[in-house]
Swiss-Prot record:
Family: Belongs to the Di19 family.
Region described as Disordered: spans on this chain: 151-190
Domain of life the protein comes from: Eukaryota
UniProt protein name: Protein DEHYDRATION-INDUCED 19 homolog 6
Organism whose genome encodes this protein: Oryza sativa subsp. japonica
Matches recorded under Pfam families: Di19_C, zf-Di19
Biased composition (Basic and acidic residues): 153-163, 170-190
Length: 208
């Protein structure tokens, strides 16, 4: 609304707009309440008037000639009214937003919280929960494991020691094998000499 004031020294009137703060506060103070109901399949809170769309899109639920997924009763034409009346104990009401001309600190915190809930509401309506910014404990464990320093040096030293031990044992086996080969050669030579000696003895006896 506007109020008119007369200037000094003249008859000209100038319209100066004024605001009816009482009316503005009454309009701004009217909060809109939204009704939510948990989905019977995925338990995500969905607005009542979006529940049918959510069931059809997310869970392929045929609303035509279907029964209520909660109470198994036949659904009427007004499915929203059915959920509001028959399952009122499942409904949750939330404020959409609030506004005041000079908000205090508590009112400011409340307004910011309700504003966040207002922006998160579409994700609930579409059946997709708002993303959680808290880190996943499983991922944090993997990250900590990847950043941790390697502790393979003792294992490597043990493996090297085992390798040296195996190589030394192989050398010892080769030496023993060589000694055995030398002994077998000596035995073979002795046998050949004995055979040759026996042949000579036989030849001499035959000659006489």
């Amino acid at each position: 609304m506007a109020s008119y004031h007369q200037q000094q020294g003249g008859s000209t009137f100038m319209a100066i707009p004024t605001i009816n703060f009482q009316m503005y506060s009454e309009i701004a103070g009217d909060d809109e309440w939204w009704e939510y109901i948990p989905c019977p399949f995925c338990y995500i809170e969905v607005e009542v008037h979006f529940l049918c769309d959510h069931l059809q899109e997310e869970h392929c639920f045929d609303m035509k000639n279907a029964v209520c997924p909660i109470c198994a009763d036949n659904l009427d034409k007004d499915t929203d009214e059915h959920f509001r009346v028959q399952h009122s104990h499942l409904l949750k009401r939330r404020k959409s937003s609030s506004f005041s001309c000079k908000p205090s600190s508590a009112a400011a915190d409340k307004g910011s919280y309700e504003e966040d809930s207002y922006f998160e509401a579409p994700s609930h309506c579409m059946g997709r929960p708002a993303p959680d910014s808290s880190p996943d404990p499983l991922l944090s464990q993997f990250i900590c494991c990847s950043l941790a320093p390697p502790v393979d040096s003792p294992r490597r030293s043990e493996a090297d020691a085992e390798g040296h031990g195996s190589s030394s044992s192989d050398d010892q086996k080769r030496r023993e094998q060589g000694v055995m080969d030398d002994a077998s050669k000596e035995e073979l030579e002795e046998r050949l000499q004995r055979i040759e000696f026996v042949k000579q003895m036989l030849m001499t006896t035959i000659a006489y």
